[in-house]
Every structure is written in structure tokens, then in C-alpha cells.
């Protein structure tokens, strides 16, 4: 998936536009951008986009992309984006009252490995609940 395809997501387009203007999209915005973009773009391109915004340089951008890819973080859910809005000045989701917005899983066609990872996590969560254990850590 190319950059143009990422722009089909209004949420990702908002982040891309803000980065292009050199804005600070906040730590959660950078994490959201990296966790999505790293699934669709070469790592070097994700780093270059993160460097455009204020709030971090090349070292921080490379470290974030490495962390996201090595740990296999999945893109955040809509609810998580709404939680992120409360934690920082830059609003990742500018329309929190509209339930049809800011859902990355509806806005983009996620790679199969993302869907498989989520399904595996939910199975582990169900099994843990069945056995009366705590849910697996993410």
C-alpha cells in the first residue's frame, strides 16, 4: 500500500498533513502514525515523515519505528484514539462524537498479519477468561 492509499483514511490524512506542516502531533500521534504507516510503507519513509513534524528528531523517529516493528504493535482502535485525545494537545480524532470517524480498521484495509494477530490475541484473552486468569498483556 502506498502513501496515496494511506491518505484514503481521514485519520491518517490528518496526521500526514500535520507532519507535512511541521506540527507536533504529540507522542500518541507519532505512535499512531508509526504503528499504521510501518505496516504499509518502508521504514525509512516512515522515519522521514516523523522527522517532518516537530517533537522529535531522527534518532527518536528511528527508535519509535524500530520499537513498533520489533514489538509488532497493531494500529490503535477507535476507542484508544479517543483516549489518546485526552492525553495530548494534538487531537488525533477531531470529531470524537461522530461514531463513524477515526476507526482505522474501517478506513484502511489492514494487512492480513494485523488481523491474524488481533484474532490470536482475542483467542488468548478468551482462554484466559475461561480459566479465570488475567487477560494476556499487549
Which sequence ranges carry the predicted segments?
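Basic, alpha-helical nucleic-acid-binding regions used in initiation and control of genome expression
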Residues: 1-138
Amino acid at each position: 500500500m502506498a502513501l496515496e492509499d494511506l491518505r484514503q483514511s481521514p485519520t491518517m490524512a490528518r496526521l500526514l498533513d500535520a507532519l507535512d506542516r511541521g506540527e507536533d502531533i504529540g507522542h500518541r500521534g507519532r505512535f499512531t502514525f508509526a504503528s499504521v504507516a510501518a505496516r504499509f510503507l518502508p521504514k525509512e519513509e516512515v522515519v522521514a515523515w516523523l522527522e517532518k513534524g516537530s517533537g522529535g528528531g531522527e534518532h527518536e523517529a528511528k527508535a519509535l519505528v524500530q520499537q513498533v516493528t520489533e514489538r509488532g504493535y497493531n494500529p490503535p482502535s477507535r476507542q484508544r484514539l479517543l483516549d489518546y485525545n485526552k492525553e495530548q494537545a494534538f487531537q488525533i480524532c477531531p470529531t470524537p462524537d461522530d461514531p463513524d470517524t477515526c476507526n482505522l480498521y474501517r478506513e484502511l484495509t489492514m494487512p492480513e498479519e494485523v488481523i491474524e494477530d488481533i484474532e490470536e490475541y482475542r483467542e488468548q484473552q478468551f482462554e484466559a477468561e475461561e480459566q479465570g486468569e488475567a487477560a494476556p498483556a499487549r
